[in-house]
Amino acid sequence: MSRRTRCEDLDELHYQDVDSDLLEQRDNRCKVKWTHEEDEQLRALVRQFGQQDWKFLASHFPNRTDQQCQYRWLRVLNPDLVKGPWTKEEDQKVIELVKKYGTKQWTLIAKHLKGRLGKQCRERWHNHLNPEVKKSCWTEEEDRIICEAHKVLGNRWAEIAKMLPGRTDNAVKNHWNSTIKRKVDTGGFPAESRDCKPVYLLLELEDKEQHQGVQPVDGQGSLVSSWPLVPSIVKEESSEEEIAIAATSAKELGHEPVPADLGEVRTPEPPESLKREYQEFSSPETSLPYKWVVEAANLLIPAVGSSLSEALDLIESDPDAWCDLSKFDLPEEPSTEGSVVSSPVQPQTSQQQQEEALQSSQQAATPGPSVTEYRLDGHTISDLSRSSRGELIPISPSTEFGGSGIGTPPSVLKRQKKRRVALSPVTENSASLSFLDSCNSLTPKSTPVKTLPFSPSQFLNFWNKQDTLELESPSLTSTPVCSQKVVVTTPLHRDKTPLHQKYPSSEVLPDQKYSMDNTPHTPTPFKNALEKYGPLKPLPQTPHLEEDLKEVLRSEAGMELIIEDDMRPEKQKRKPGLRRSPIKKVRKSLALDIMDEDGKLMSSTMPKPLSLPTSVTPSSCGFTSPGSKEGNSLLNQGFLQAKPEKVVAAQKTRSHIPTPAPMTHAWKTVACGGTKDQLFMQEKARQLLSRLKSSHTSRTLILS
């Protein structure tokens, strides 16, 4: 929770009626907040008529009294009021005046401080200037005390602050709203450790409340109880499962089991001092207010004067024995109406337990009157210990013992060992029959289950390869069709044979197979493509990257060009130092590929000479005739057959290109930098370069 700024507090105070604690004329007052128009009207009236006659000023307001107008002016609207931060001189003045007048005369102290009110001086002293106020960090013990006290007292910060010496009510409230409340709401508040002592609150009760009974402090369900004058007699009984186990073991050994009766438990009485205090408290002659102790479990215990420390020492000496409910039992005799009234009980000692166990065994050996036993679930006690309210314990009488000493146990205790159903990997019919027979042989549950119209095993079957392929490549239909095959079979147990027994040593396990395989694993869509087009053939890595890219580009262009690499082998040879890298060759070949095609087309359209030298053959020049050898590829022949069409198309396009018009003198002047401004800029550039040339070395631009 973020703290509010000073301006927000002043704005709220500006429009708030803060004179609600005045005692006079309470019926005729208007408790509505002052509006902005009323404040402006009051300022104007005070400037005009002064502060002498407040009744006359209040007559201008329909529902405001003279005291309200005066209070509003003096506490809120007075321009002489100082509402800013305190200075060191003001703090020192307040400390001196408190030493002189005490901490009660705040109105008198405020008269010595110009522009300050008594309320401001009081809050400044109690929150900041008081030397007893702690300004250190909050400890975990203080947080725990605030949390426990807030459960009982609520937002009564003044009373909570009395439990924390050195902390003010305002500091406690701010710490709760900013830190502890968030931790409690989110469950992040640390749980109470065993070493922490319980919190005790001292509350004073008036005399009139003594005869009416003590009420809960904060209405939060705190349990109010008086000190038990007579300790109740309780009995302990073992749980149901222990009874059944003891009965079965006794039958096997041939002995009759002894009923679980631990006898009566005598609890220690409270101290005599507490008895006297309780009797004095209950007597009608007492008129003084008494102090009550509120323990961490929200129990109110009467205590007076010096005996309070004795009661606290008694509880603190053995908190486990006083607060552990696991050692407590129930009353032995039920009421006639069938209801059981719970009463406070006290723990027992180990020596008493041994003596009473001895007595119970003797009583069990001798026949005696029938005793009604009570059965109690252990979870009930644990739930009751967590509860903060007074509740009755639900108890139901157990079955009576017969003449033989033991009766039939209840149906809940007739438990059989669960039979394990082992299904062998056989046919579906036999497996389903054996599974149904084994299910019928089991002990029926309390709630019958209706047979299902379908087999649950259809959700557990694994898909085969055909189903996977159909889901990956479904058929394109207007209506989606489910291609999964419904197989109604009984699920069998998974084969849990170890891998070293299931697979021989000669075979390779799946994980070893994948670890030894160096080839990357192909995803399923690529596997489908490989099945369609055939497996990939590994090809050796070729160093002729340029030729491979040429083949790809020519195949995409839909034509085949004649490679003339064999024509000039000497020109292609270069010196070892000037050899280009394959990347530069590829870059250049990609850029000059189109120029290569145009040059070949132009060379094919040139007319053949009448006589060719004998050393030059058509095959060496790169041309092929239609009647050449069959060794030429079909693509080369197709290229030669399609030559006349391309030539005609090229001639048509060139014939339609118009001749460019000659440039005029004005165009040349503008385009070639002959205007005045261009010449001026050129001259300036030359001058700049001439200046820089003497001081800087020229660098040539290398374009490669």
UniProtKB/Swiss-Prot annotation:
Which parts of this chain does the entry mark as a DNA-binding region? 54-77, 106-129, 157-180
Which sequence positions carry the modification called Phosphothreonine?
T267, T443, T447, T490, T497, T524
Q: Which organism is it from?
A: Mus musculus
UniProt domain HTH myb-type: residue ranges = 26-77, 78-133, 134-184
Q: Does the keyword Phosphoprotein apply?
A: yes
Q: Where in or outside the cell?
A: Nucleus
Could you identify this protein by its name? Myb-related protein B
| Region (Disordered) residue spans | 325-412, 603-626
Briefly state the modifications made to the protein after translation.
Phosphorylated by cyclin A/CDK2 during S-phase. Phosphorylation at Thr-524 is probably involved in transcriptional activity.
User: Which GO MF terms are attached to this record?
Assistant: DNA-binding transcription activator activity, RNA polymerase II-specific; RNA polymerase II cis-regulatory region sequence-specific DNA binding
Q: Superkingdom of this entry's organism?
A: Eukaryota
The terms describing its cellular component in GO are: cytosol; Myb complex; nucleoplasm; nucleus
Q: Where is the composition biased (Low complexity)?
A: 339-366, 607-620
Description of how the protein assembles with itself and partners? Component of the DREAM complex (also named LINC complex) at least composed of E2F4, E2F5, LIN9, LIN37, LIN52, LIN54, MYBL1, MYBL2, RBL1, RBL2, RBBP4, TFDP1 and TFDP2. The complex exists in quiescent cells where it represses cell cycle-dependent genes. It dissociates in S phase when LIN9, LIN37, LIN52 and LIN54 form a subcomplex that binds to MYBL2. Interacts with CCNF (via the Cyclin N-terminal domain).
- UniProt lists the gene as Mybl2
Find the cross-link Glycyl lysine isopeptide (Lys-Gly) (interchain with G-Cter in SUMO2): 104, 197, 275, 414, 450, 485, 502, 513, 527, 537, 550, 588, 600, 629, 643, 652
Among the record's GO biological process terms, what is one?
A: cellular response to leukemia inhibitory factor
Modified residue annotations for Phosphoserine: S282, S396, S581
SUPFAM superfamilies cross-referenced by the UniProt entry: Homeodomain-like
| Main function | Transcription factor involved in the regulation of cell survival, proliferation, and differentiation. Transactivates the expression of the CLU gene.
Keywords associated with the record: DNA-binding, Isopeptide bond, Nucleus, Phosphoprotein, Repeat, Transcription, Transcription regulation, Ubl conjugation
**Keyword Nucleotide-binding attributed:** no
SMART domains for the chain = SANT (SM00717)
